[in-house]
Design a protein with these regions (language model features):
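Short aromatic-acidic-glycine turn motif
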Residues: 11-22
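Beta-strand signatures of extracellular beta-sandwich domains
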Residues: 5-9
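Solvent-exposed serine/threonine-rich low-complexity stretches and specific carbohydrate-binding patches
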Residues: 21-27, 35-36
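Extracellular/periplasmic metallocenter environments
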Residues: 1, 32-81
């Protein structure tokens, strides 16, 4: 199955370590204080939902898919104004 998730980071500089650890764990990220919010891994037949409070600090918050080899291209930014 082709799995995907969305992991929103508080600090983009944490991305390499969080991605590396997740890829070593089958794509599932470990609980980490540097993660703002995340969905569980899901396949194309599933829907997942999360609810969270966006940071009050304006900025760009990186989101990535942490499934194996996906983070390089499956990424973007949540913009807080």
């Amino acid at each position: 199955a082709m799995l995907h998730n969305v992991v929103i980071l508080k600090d983009e500089s944490a991305a390499p370590m969080i991605i590396q650890l997740a890829e070593g764990n089958g794509g599932e990220p470990y609980a980490d204080g540097r993660i703002l919010a995340m969905t569980p891994l899901a396949d194309k037949q599933e829907e997942t939902f999360i609810e969270f409070t966006a940071p009050s600090k304006p900025g760009r918050y990186l989101y990535v898919c942490t499934y194996i080899a996906h983070a390089g291209s499956m990424r973007g930014y949540m913009i807080v104004e």
